[in-house]
Amino acid sequence: MTDKTPTQNDTSFNPSPLNPDRRLVLGGIAAAIGAASVDSSAQAATHSRRDVLKGTALSDSAVDAALREKIENVVVIFCENRSFNNLFADFPGLQVPLSVVDPETYKQRDRDGTQLKTLPPIWNGMVPEKQVVEHKEYLIAQGDITGLANAPFALKTPQGDPLPHGVVTRDLVHAFYNNQLQINDGKNDGFVAWGDSGALVMGHYGEASAKLRLWNIAREFTLCDNFFMGVFGGSFVNHQYLICARPPFYPEADKSPAKGGITKLDPSDPKGLRPLLREGSPASAMEGPAKFTSNVLTPDFYAVNTMTPPYAPAYKLDPAKPGYADWTSPSTLIPQTHKTIGDVLSDKGVSWAWYSGGWGTALAGGSTPDFAGHASFQVHHQPFNYYSRFAPGTADRAEHLRDAGEGESPRTNKLLADIAAGKLPAVTFYKPQGNLNMHAGYSDVEAGDQHIAVMVDALRRSPQWGKMLVVITFDENGGWWDHIAPPKGDRWGPGTRIPAVIVSPHAKKGHVDHSVYDTGSILRFITRRWGLEKLPGLIEREKAMQAVDGTLPGDLTGALDLA
């Protein structure tokens, strides 16, 4: 390995030339260190998007003044892998609740375009690992639920009982090319065909209104029902979008250890979106999941599916250079140098931090098993750890990348301690530890829901609460289906609709905001509140969306009462 950071030569961000989980438990780090076109109502919602962008009767200058007066702290709680429908399908006041959607518009199609007669099995089973929840044992195998109708469904046991929110289901594929094929120009009829979990993608929690604390928070404050994930695909690239509104870039990837991950697109696909399928990949969704060849990097070398950071915590470390990953590994992304929201905040002298649950334990080599109830840690959920500005030993790393600790007590959770002490910076990003983030496969909805409630309760008791805005949202849909078509944008997104709840003394109360937002809207709000330089990726997204139908993604002010 060389000490020299590779040069990216990527100063002019150009998202337009082409058509458009791994997880790590703390024990793994220890080893490394030791070694829509939907129904007519939905279409009407799409057409009305431009009518709900501003969300306030105040002039722009009055909004700016009100933001400076009323908001001094922004807190972003970034959860994992749930579509809007999966948790909020029929929340009161939605523009287009699931229950009013014409059944013909949500019918799923096979990979050849024909409509499926039934849904396929849930490949490998809905609950493939035995677990005890509420004193009852759960193990739901592939053969236990079959022949489901081609329709969305409430998640249930084979006996027909509602699946408890505390049960960890199997994971679902959530990746850049898959998501675009699933959305299928807004028809959202390819989720089964291009997923890897069979029928499971169409599931949602039918008892959410009675069981989820997040529903109660949304009832009290503002739920956004047109909030879309910033990028098609998975956690890695959507965490990157949260901090810089663009994917990472790997220069000369074709000459690098990562060259095997460069996508080869199928020349027979007229849209240029489908990677080549492996030999023997099932022809029909009823026979099994589609299997792609490598699809980590785009043909022009943007990293769109999971790569690991150049610095610890990482899966594979450089034994000769403590704190650094092995840069010869094909999964390691070279250090990035383009601007992030952290850079522009620092340039303006605005305090900020990324708090990560389990960060300190991961760096120290703590070890726990890989399942819910244990503090798993995901290296690709730490976006600033991919940038040379935050390399080990730098002042910026020490100041801005903070250990949130673990659990739900101020004794062990350092973010909770800072909240109670009124010591939060102006902008706080919080990434919960893995078993509390709601990610299917290793976390459950109930644990994450409880954790959100604990954090919100603490924030409301903080001395900083009076001038605070909290955004609770998800990185991406986790592969779960949604019926609302994302607005047309640039080659990166927006992707599938996800939940977002705005919590603040200045949020509209008991409100559903129909404004069009994406993950970048969080950056737009921060940029507007502190008068920052707007990141190039935000500008590119706005130009692309406006060129389609005049829609501009909002900046969250539609959720606020600033009068």
Regions found by a protein language model. Name each.
Residues 2-20, 24-563:
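N-terminal pro-sequences and low-complexity stem/linker regions of secreted or lumenal proteins
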